[in-house]
Amino acid sequence: MEQIEFDYTQPINDEWKKIMEKHLRTAKTFEIHCWNEETTWIEYALKYGTLKNDDWQYGKNIVGLVSTDFVNMVLQLPKPKDTEIYNKMTPFFSIFLDNGFSSEHYGTELNQQ
């Protein structure tokens, strides 16, 4: 796995969005992970996918197709304001794409397999 370097301490998420856009272009499916208490974001992600049946007791996984609507949603998300623990780039804890790309820990870690 190769870590993609970028400055996740930025006050805006433009660089994160630019990297996401590049990788979304070649992806066909996604999987989003949210913690159980992130109900607003679980409901939001469910507009673009369905709940994956798994045994993760601490959260929910949403899977779906990388459609134009999904890409637009990801790229138009505002940078979260709750940045005390993480300087969040996205409200989603993890976003995995079928092309091996992942945005983890609220977008502070980007990886490519």
Label for each model-derived stretch:
Residues 1-113:
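Structured alpha/beta or helical-core interaction and ligand-binding surfaces enriched in interleaved
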